[in-house]
């Protein structure tokens, strides 16, 4: 697992208060991890801060799963 994946999963566990075992790449933030729309906005903000990257609104809307976040950040973070 990549460093980015580890960091994304840590952020998800901290922000959503879920068990680390539930945070898989296929886990949907809302359907599987119990996030609401505010939680997803806060997650995007946390990803932006952690990875020093801006996630445009249109891209943020496509980040539905842990794997989506990892792929976006692997492609766009320095």
From Swiss-Prot:
Q: What pathway annotation does it carry?
A: Lipid metabolism; fatty acid biosynthesis
Can you list the GO cellular component terms from the UniProt entry?
Answer: cytosol; membrane
In this chain, where does the modification O-(pantetheine 4'-phosphoryl)serine occur? 37
Modifications the protein undergoes after translation, according to the UniProt entry:
4'-phosphopantetheine is transferred from CoA to a specific serine of apo-ACP by AcpS. This modification is essential for activity because fatty acids are bound in thioester linkage to the sulfhydryl of the prosthetic group.
Any idea which GO molecular function terms this record carries? acyl binding; acyl carrier activity
A Gene Ontology BP annotation from the UniProt entry: lipid A biosynthetic process
Provide this UniProt record's keywords sorted from A to Z. Cytoplasm, Fatty acid biosynthesis, Fatty acid metabolism, Lipid biosynthesis, Lipid metabolism, Phosphopantetheine, Phosphoprotein
Q: This protein's superkingdom?
A: Bacteria
List the InterPro entries.
Answer: ACP (IPR003231), ACP-like_sf (IPR036736), PP-bd_ACP (IPR009081), Ppantetheine_attach_site (IPR006162)
Cell location: Cytoplasm
**Chain ranges of the Carrier domain:** 2-77
The reply on keyword Nucleotidyltransferase is: no
Q: Which PANTHER family match?
A: ACYL CARRIER PROTEIN (PTHR20863), CARRIER DOMAIN-CONTAINING PROTEIN (PTHR20863:SF76)
Say what the protein does: Carrier of the growing fatty acid chain in fatty acid biosynthesis.
**Family note:** Belongs to the acyl carrier protein (ACP) family.
User: Which protein is depicted?
Assistant: Acyl carrier protein
**Organism from which the protein derives:** Methylobacterium sp. (strain 4-46)
**Which lineage?**
Bacteria, Pseudomonadati, Pseudomonadota, Alphaproteobacteria, Hyphomicrobiales
